Amino acid sequence: MLRLELHRENLMRRTIVGFAILIIICAGVRSVRAGDKIDVPKVITKSDVEKIVGAPVKDPKGRNKNGTDGYYESEWSYRSIEGNAGIYFDVLYAGQGAPAHLTRTMFSMLPADKSKSTPVDGLGDKAIFCPNETGMAMLHVLKGDILITIGFHGQAPKTVLDSEKSLATKILASL
């Protein structure tokens, strides 16, 4: 009888300890996933942009936003102090509450102004370069459920693709 009670106590203790460990692991995974979201200015610095633009730029303006529909977006821009050069970034994560294949559907509808696009190899799952979309040279990269958009204004579209690819590579490496 005593042996049965000790066995029950041990079983109960092991169950509680196992459950506590499971909760700790789940909480850790959740915090890693929540902390994994990109903050563009921490990855692409003002100094990085100044090297590409070739001139001093203003501090970044933008936001990081958790959407109510299960998405996260880091949307930032850097503008030159003089002239009209600037670089725009938008990194969109489709969250668990987002419609299935949201970012893939969005990517398939690009470029937004229906101008000509060129596929770009070696970036994410798919990438396209849109040299004249909305007055900017835009690079769109799809990686899983993440859509990255980089827009460059103020220089000839032919000259910015390599810079945009370099910036996209840096963002992809931080995901």
Explain the meaning of each model-derived region.
Residues L4-F19:
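Bacterial N-terminal signal peptides that target proteins for export
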Residues R14-T15, S31, G122:
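Hydrophobic alpha-helical segments, especially transmembrane helices
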Residues G18-A27:
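Bacterial N-terminal signal peptides
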Residues C26-G35:
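Bacterial Sec-dependent signal peptides at the C-terminal "C-region" and cleavage site
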Residues A34-D36, P41, K46, E50, ...:
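A short, solvent-exposed beta-edge/loop patch
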Residues K51-C130:
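Short, solvent-exposed recognition patches
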